[in-house]
Amino acid sequence: MRIHYLLFSFLLVLLSPLSAFSKKVYNAVSCMTNGGICWLKCSGTFREIGSCGTRQLKCCKKK
């Protein structure tokens, strides 16, 4: 039964980096790394995933 605890902890360690993708982007380099573009306003085919360092610039990514 102890192997179940080991496998469960191993699974948690493997899946924990996946939660990092749900965090907002706050600078232009992170925006481009995540496949986004810095624009003033996201158009209809794009969704906002964060900001590019200022309040005016939004990091937009295709839906």
Curated annotation (Swiss-Prot):
- GO terms, molecular function: CCR6 chemokine receptor binding; chemoattractant activity
Please report the propeptide residues according to the UniProt annotation: 21-22
Instruction: Quote any Pfam family the record assigns.
Output: Defensin_beta
Report the InterPro entries cross-referenced here. Defensin_beta-like (IPR001855)
Keyword Disulfide bond set for record: yes
Q: Name one GO biological process term.
A: defense response to bacterium
Q: Where in the cell is it found?
A: Secreted
Biological role stated in the UniProt entry: Has bactericidal activity.
Recorded protein name is: Beta-defensin 3
Which organism was this protein described from?
Rattus norvegicus (Rat)
